[in-house]
Amino acid sequence: MEKFDRKPQIADIPPKMVKKYGSGKMLIPSPRDIDEIIRSVGKGRLITQEQIREKLAEKYGVNITCPMTTGIFISKIIALMAEEKIRKGEGDVTPYWRVVGKNGVLNPKFPGGVEMQARRLEEEGHKIIYDRKPRVKDYQKYLVK
């Protein structure tokens, strides 16, 4: 829980990231902020990690949100906490499986890998295209705004 409640931080965009993102300010988000956004994604809907980062950057008035920490917090804190609640039979679970990558690609770093994410998404009515990188068919139609 300590890591979940860490405070967001704002820093200069590191020199090694300036070429890709430009100079300015970068948010190192809190898992709680990310969790709130994921919880707002209703059944049958999807959100990309990029959308999460954009929403947080706008909320905090910065240029970008750190892509690395966002991904780590989703797969290593939020998803694991959700799975623990599911295992214990508790309600109020963050639907982390609704977070997809670029082009609707499933996340192999989630608990249970792409297989579990695919199963949960299929249970919510999504069709999965199983190829080299499994992804949600027509994912753009289901993205939150």
Feature-to-residue mapping (PLM):
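Nucleic acid-binding interface residues in structured DNA/RNA-binding domains
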Residues: 1-145
